[in-house]
């Protein structure tokens, strides 16, 4: 379970470094690039996707680029209406039949051409991504992001068979969506199970472990590229993810990575999972936290340094740059 690490590892003996949401509103250069475009228009603009993605490696000097897109881009394949005002707003009925596009290359041409452009322009690997099934379903049923996803949970409890059918349809579409991105040139896949923290522990296996196992299994039947799963959960549920077949596991900041390394006999490749609020601290305090964090992690095999959630909009760019400089200056013993 180290293929994802192998794709992005640097030539020097240190952990690779990249971040969730490493390009975004905290960057003045991104704000200038976006200008007055709506977010949806920006996400459908091949040149904008290309230029925004390049900001990560160029400004931060990280070891990988992640495609600048949104998890809702998948919905183009289902012809589901959505917008950002400013957050995600989705028009969806759980009783409508989901049919995925028969021509994904045309439907996602704006994204696939950006990937082809980026592969030529980048000197680091490009990561494609998508939401995992439960997370995508939660956005659909609640009409966007939500703290507690009440409509999702009510539908799940009241109509478990229909919810399972929705997860199956989303899985099928996601496989096609990601397969096309890999064929366009992306080197690896990051899956995001961002809504999973809402689930009671006893439902985690059914709605997170099982659907992600199916998704990863189907992906590996048609592509050879490595897959990482980011999942919001606690230590107990995180251990359940070792059965899903991912090449790398990426917990959010709720999981104690040191504990995982001490208690799991073969922890495999892990990435994460520093709390992104630490990037808001004065630089000396931030760097002190990073050095403490890496004391035990930097020598772990196949470890990738990353954040435990996306970089916050109010983060000073210079703090992230200082963090990368600190992290890329270390060496393993």
Swiss-Prot record:
Its main location: cytoplasm. Substrate binds at residues 21-25, 70, 139, 194, 309. Catalyzes the decarboxylation of four acetate groups of uroporphyrinogen-III to yield coproporphyrinogen-III. The keyword Cytoplasm applies. GO terms for molecular function: uroporphyrinogen decarboxylase activity. Its EC number is 4.1.1.37. Keywords: Cytoplasm, Decarboxylase, Lyase, Porphyrin biosynthesis. Gene3D superfamilies: 3.20.20.210. It catalyses: uroporphyrinogen III + 4 H(+) = coproporphyrinogen III + 4 CO2. GO terms for cellular component: cytosol. It comes from Chlamydia caviae (strain ATCC VR-813 / DSM 19441 / 03DC25 / GPIC) (Chlamydophila caviae). It is found in: Cytoplasm. It holds the Pfam family URO-D. This is Uroporphyrinogen decarboxylase. GO terms for biological process: protoporphyrinogen IX biosynthetic process. It comes from the Bacteria. Belongs to the uroporphyrinogen decarboxylase family. Pathway: Porphyrin-containing compound metabolism; protoporphyrin-IX biosynthesis; coproporphyrinogen-III from 5-aminolevulinate: step 4/4. NCBIfam families: hemE. It is an enzyme of class 4 (lyase). The record marks 70 as: Transition state stabilizer. The lineage of its organism: Bacteria, Pseudomonadati, Chlamydiota, Chlamydiia, Chlamydiales. Homodimer.
